[in-house]
Amino acid sequence: YFVQAGAFSKQDTAHSLSRKLTQFGNARVAEADVDGKRFYRVRLGPFSFPEEAEVTLAKVRNYGIQNASVVRD
């Protein structure tokens, strides 16, 4: 499980957010191609259990990123 804080078309934007979120754990940028377009996903984790991810999700949302969500690869 991961907490996805956002997905961006600009790599610099994703890395900027990732650096800010390191206070909540292992934040990183993962590249993804969707419909022929490259996106840079900012994710925290991995977490072994969804409950662990939910705790971090609450912290990220309290930080102001309301559209963050728990995802599973």
Regions found by a protein language model. Give the residues of each.
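Extracytoplasmic
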Residues: 9-73
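Short glycine-/aliphatic-rich beta-strand segments at the starts of folded cytosolic domains
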Residues: 1-5
